[in-house]
Amino acid sequence: MRRERPELRDAEGRLRLRAGCLVTAWPRAPSGAGSWSMAAASPWPASWGFPDASSTVPSLCTEARAGRGGPATARSRVSADSQGGRAGSSSPSSALRLCCAGPSQAHPGPSPAVLPGRCGLLGSFPRPPAPQGRWGPSLG
């Protein structure tokens, strides 16, 4: 059985107290590189977004809606590189940031609206060294 990281569990507790929702996130690979798996449960219709590294406005990742049988669960995969900064960044670690918006008011179209919400930092995992050579950063 997977052992929980204490800092991740603490972050989940704080986020649940502040935003009224529960979020779990973990790297899909043992090294913490590549994509993440994310499971989110909310007691009300909510919008879930991952903030873009270059913007303060969260870009919507997936939406969770409450069902008749209880809280809805939404799962999504995201790239760790897109969360800890741009690919090739010299940042020593990549962190998964998640925004949980409050109760959804209205959606203007078929695609979910991006709503303002509270953000939480869920864990910090080491970033693998940037690839060198053809795909590495240019020193020019």
Swiss-Prot record:
Low complexity bias (residue ranges): 71-94
Domain of life of the organism encoding this protein: Eukaryota
Renumbered residue ranges of the record's region Disordered: 62-140
Additional remarks: This protein is produced by a bicistronic transcript which also produces the C9orf163 protein from an non-overlapping reading frame.
Protein name as it appears in the record: Uncharacterized protein FLJ30774
